């Protein structure tokens, strides 16, 4: 018959962001354990609250699957004595396997015969195997761990109780001094300890004690109550899914309620109000049907409706205090000019090994100026870029950002507009921080995009020059994210940004203002920074599901513009299914490999047709001449088509021509032919890294 197993790990309150990943980990480890133990089951179902991590396993088999395996013993030569009797070695082997010499058979392995026996291992009862779930529970890993008592065991929070049931029987084991049983704990204030009669009665038992253990059901209940409240008041309650997930993991029995704040606080920018409610208080904010912010908020209580008015009043009081601070800072900040704030930045350190924020802005101004010109920004955009890059960090020393650090850039844009800065300048101040995550929103304006690239480039250059380089998972200055940001912006804008261009920008800034680099002189060995950025390029491109060998090929050429690497990968992926792809790549790869053996030819070197010794040399030269002129201006897909058109000529050429001829002039002429073709293939990286079968 099928069985149901339940394991509940009762804990002190777990941080909300840890709950879901932890119970998912428990599911994965339970699944792995059952499979390794050869126990059939239907499903592993997770339940979780801030005080418990639970799995329920349905459809469990009665016992492990039986297995029959072969055990290898000594060689036949050792197993039999000179008279053909079983030796002590053979007898000891079968005794250890629980069989007799009558069960022996021989099998050859690498030319030698060995003793083998078949060994039947009956499956253990599931009740006996499930005691091993102790190790599963103890093996969970968490972002932060703690110890308690006098032991060395580490866990997310102290374990307070354990429930382990196979149907209606307790599965006995012990973690530290906590023994498994059937007694669970209800809601901290509304419930009490209660016995779970059987594994399949877990949810309904907890519901009697005001605990909704199914996180999905709990979240749906929160959403329903929010929807009912919105309908009742004709509101639009903005439900951020991440916030809903967090709130769901803060409560065991949710009750949604609404509160309000004074309308006078609506004069404070919406971004500040929303941050105060959403990020600081975990409230959902409310708008009217036209999207205008209303002086109301919605929150979730971990409990029922008893004395709810006191809860509402308490939350209103806390929010009012925060909004009063925000209103004060907003009004106070406007008493000073942008120039005042910029002046203060001269005394604020960006990093003690790098310099002040003001010095960083001066470097970024030079980098942005160079990049803006190279990328073809208009005169107006260049003017706005120059202004934005000299003030874009000013809001860091405002009172508002001091209190709400997550509003940096956002308040800069708001204050810049209030002080009459051009729209492009104001927008760029906010967009400079984009993207704020590996998949975050990108700058839309050209000014903001260049400013963002310049700032990130300066940070990477400065920290690498100061030898503060990310290693392993350690990246305290988010340099990986900043490199990803540069690449993603370049790809989004379609700009020809490459590593050589970025190095050129740094060298330009250094030449213009060497004093700004007194602590972070541009490093002469750029291979480490190049590898760092190329790794991020590969990471971005991998999101497009390109083949690994195609990725390796296109990122192998470090000087290629990022957008070209993307286009090359797209074209190679498209043509990888062509019938002749293998032959084309093999022909071109043969060219590139031999071209590497060529001496250094000058840029003005020309192929000497008088040194040709067979028709294939002339045919290939003629074919190359036809395509070379238009190749540079062709689109990437057309370039691959052009290279493919040379396949037959290249194949015939190699069939008829000995490249490494005895005559030095002839040999070099042939190598020059190959070098010129190989140079065209470099638009696709290193084709010899492609795997073709």
UniProtKB/Swiss-Prot annotation:
Annotated GO biological process: arginyl-tRNA aminoacylation; glycyl-tRNA aminoacylation
Keyword match Membrane: no
Reaction(s) this enzyme catalyzes, per UniProt: tRNA(Gly) + glycine + ATP = glycyl-tRNA(Gly) + AMP + diphosphate
For this protein, the Enzyme Commission number is: 6.1.1.14
**PROSITE patterns according to UniProt:** AA_TRNA_LIGASE_II_GLYAB (PS50861)
Annotated keywords: Aminoacyl-tRNA synthetase, ATP-binding, Cytoplasm, Ligase, Nucleotide-binding, Protein biosynthesis
Localization per Swiss-Prot or TrEMBL: Cytoplasm
Q: Which NCBIfam families does this chain map to?
A: glyS (TIGR00211)
Protein name according to UniProt: Glycine--tRNA ligase beta subunit
Q: Which organism is it from?
A: Ligilactobacillus salivarius (strain UCC118) (Lactobacillus salivarius)
In the UniProt record, what gene is named as encoding this protein?
glyS
């Amino acid at each position: 018959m099928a069985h149901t197993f339940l394991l509940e790990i009762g804990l002190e309150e777990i941080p909300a962001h840890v709950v879901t990943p932890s119970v998912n980990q428990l599911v994965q480890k339970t699944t792995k354990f059952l499979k390794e133990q050869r126990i059939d089951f239907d499903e592993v179902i997770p339940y979780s609250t801030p005080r418990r991590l639970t799995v329920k396993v349905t459809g469990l088999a009665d016992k492990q699957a039986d297995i029959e395996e072969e055990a290898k013993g000594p060689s036949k030569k050792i197993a039999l004595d000179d008279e053909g009797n079983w030796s002590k070695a053979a007898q000891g082997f079968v005794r250890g396997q629980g069989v007799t010499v009558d069960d022996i058979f021989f099998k050859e392995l690498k030319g030698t015969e060995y003793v083998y026996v078949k060994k039947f291992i009956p499956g253990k009862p599931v009740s006996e195997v499930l005691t091993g779930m102790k190790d599963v529970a103890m093996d969970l890993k968490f972002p932060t761990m703690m110890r308690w008592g006098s032991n060395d065991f580490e866990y997310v929070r102290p374990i307070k109780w354990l429930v382990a049931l196979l149907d209606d029987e307790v599965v006995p084991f012990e973690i530290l001094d906590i023994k498994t049983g059937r007694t669970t704990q209800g809601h901290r204030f509304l419930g009490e300890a209660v016995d779970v009669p059987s594994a399949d009665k877990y949810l309904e038992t907890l519901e009697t004690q005001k605990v909704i253990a199914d996180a999905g059901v709990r979240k749906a209940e929160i959403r329903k109550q929010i929807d009912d409240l919105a309908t009742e008041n004709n509101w639009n309650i903005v439900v951020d899914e991440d916030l809903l997930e967090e709130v769901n993991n803060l409560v065991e029995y949710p009750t949604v309620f609404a509160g309000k704040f004074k309308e006078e606080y609506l004069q404070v920018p919406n971004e500040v109000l929303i941050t105060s409610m959403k990020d600081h208080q975990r409230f959902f904010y409310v708008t009217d049907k036209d999207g205008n912010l209303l002086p109301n908020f919605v929150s979730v209580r971990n409990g029922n409706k008893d004395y709810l008015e006191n809860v509402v009043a308490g939350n209103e009081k806390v929010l009012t205090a925060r909004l009063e601070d925000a209103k004060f800072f907003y009004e106070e900040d406007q008493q000073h000019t942008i120039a005042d704030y910029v002046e203060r930045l001269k005394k604020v350190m960006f990093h003690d090994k790098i310099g002040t924020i003001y010095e960083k802005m001066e470097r970024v101004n030079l980098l942005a100026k160079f990049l803006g010109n190279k990328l073809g920004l208009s005169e107006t955009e260049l003017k706005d870029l120059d202004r934005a890059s000299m003030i874009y960090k000013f809001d860091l020393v405002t009172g508002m950002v001091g209190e709400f650090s997550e509003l940096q850039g956002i308040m800069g844009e708001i204050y810049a507009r209030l002080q009459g800065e051009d729209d492009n300048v104001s927008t760029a101040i906010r967009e400079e921080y984009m993207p704020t995550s590996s998949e975050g929103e990108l700058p839309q304006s050209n000014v903001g995009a260049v400013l963002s690239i310049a700032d990130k480039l300066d940070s990477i250059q400065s920290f690498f020059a100061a030898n503060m380089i990310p290693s392993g998972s350690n990246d305290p200055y988010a340099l990986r994210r900043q490199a990803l940001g540069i690449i993603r912006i370049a790809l989004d804008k379609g700009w020809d940004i490459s590593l050589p261009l970025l190095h050129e920008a740094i060298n330009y800034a250094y030449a213009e203002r060497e004093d700004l680099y007194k602590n972070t002189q541009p490093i002469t060995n750029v291979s480490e920074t190049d590898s760092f950025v190329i790794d991020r390029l590969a990471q971005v491109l991998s999101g497009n599901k390109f083949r690994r060998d195609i990725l390796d090929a296109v990122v192998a050429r470090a000087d290629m513009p990022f957008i070209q690497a993307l286009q090359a990968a797209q074209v190679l992926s498209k043509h990888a299914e062509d019938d002749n792809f293998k032959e084309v790549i093999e022909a071109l790869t043969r060219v590139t490999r031999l071209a590497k053996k060529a001496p250094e030819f000058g840029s003005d070197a020309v192929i000497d047709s008088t040194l040709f010794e067979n028709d294939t040399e002339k045919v290939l030269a003629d074919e190359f001449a036809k395509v070379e002129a238009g190749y540079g201006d062709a689109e990437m897909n057309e370039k691959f088509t052009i290279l493919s058109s040379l396949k037959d000529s290249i194949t015939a050429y190699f069939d008829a021509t000995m490249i490494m001829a005895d005559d030095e002039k002839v040999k070099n002429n042939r190598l020059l032919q190959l070098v010129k073709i190989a140079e065209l293939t470099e638009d696709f990286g290193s084709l010899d890294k492609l795997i073709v079968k």
